[in-house]
């Protein structure tokens, strides 16, 4: 039997995936402005910048010239973090909520490594008695 937190977790996961699919469809199929901006970016630009360009135009031009893998990384890491957090809310054990978030995951891994080193040091100090 699912409790309230699990039900809300599944509702959150389904809404998150639905909104993601709708945004993906909007950006890549419907939005003509995005297509125009992509075409303007590809067209040849004059070598000498116009004197009337503002810092926002130059910033936009520099940001649009960044590689695709960088943009994908910047958007996908937070996207997957939110998704994995919502998915962890669907677990039956409330202590496991949030373990898949990167800072928490790194803290747990480091803590396990330190406890493993302590345990191995304690075992090496013990003397085995042969009977």
Swiss-Prot record:
Localization, UniProt: Golgi apparatus membrane
Matching InterPro entries: LYSET
Keyword Heme: no
Main location: Golgi
Residue ranges of the TM segments: 8-28, 66-86
Topology of the protein relative to the lipid bilayer: Multi-pass membrane protein
One GO term describing the cellular component: Golgi apparatus
GO biological process: lysosome organization; regulation of vesicle-mediated transport
Alphabetized UniProt keyword annotations: Golgi apparatus, Membrane, Transmembrane, Transmembrane helix
First and last residue of the signal peptide: none
UniProt similarity note: Belongs to the LYSET family.
Reported function: Required for mannose-6-phosphate-dependent trafficking of lysosomal enzymes. LYSET bridges GlcNAc-1-phosphate transferase (GNPTAB), to the membrane-bound transcription factor site-1 protease (MBTPS1), thus allowing proteolytic activation of the GNPTAB. GNPTAB is involved in the regulation of M6P-dependent Golgi-to-lysosome trafficking of lysosomal enzymes. LYSET is thus an essential factor for maturation and delivery of lysosomal hydrolases.
The protein, known as: Lysosomal enzyme trafficking factor
């Amino acid at each position: 039997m699912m409790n309230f937190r699990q039900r809300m977790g599944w509702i959150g996961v389904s809404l998150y995936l639905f909104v993601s699919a709708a945004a993906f469809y909007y950006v890549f199929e419907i939005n003509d402005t995005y297509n125009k901006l992509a075409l303007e970016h590809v067209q040849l630009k004059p070598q000498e910048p116009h004197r009337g360009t503002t810092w926002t135009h130059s910033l936009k031009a520099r940001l649009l010239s960044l590689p695709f893998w960088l943009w994908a990384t910047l958007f996908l890491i937070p996207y997957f973090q939110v998704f994995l957090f919502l998915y962890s809310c669907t677990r039956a054990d409330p202590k496991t909520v949030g373990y898949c978030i990167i800072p928490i995951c790194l803290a747990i891994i480091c803590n396990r490594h330190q406890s493993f080193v302590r345990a191995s040091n304690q075992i090496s100090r013990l003397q085995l008695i042969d009977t």
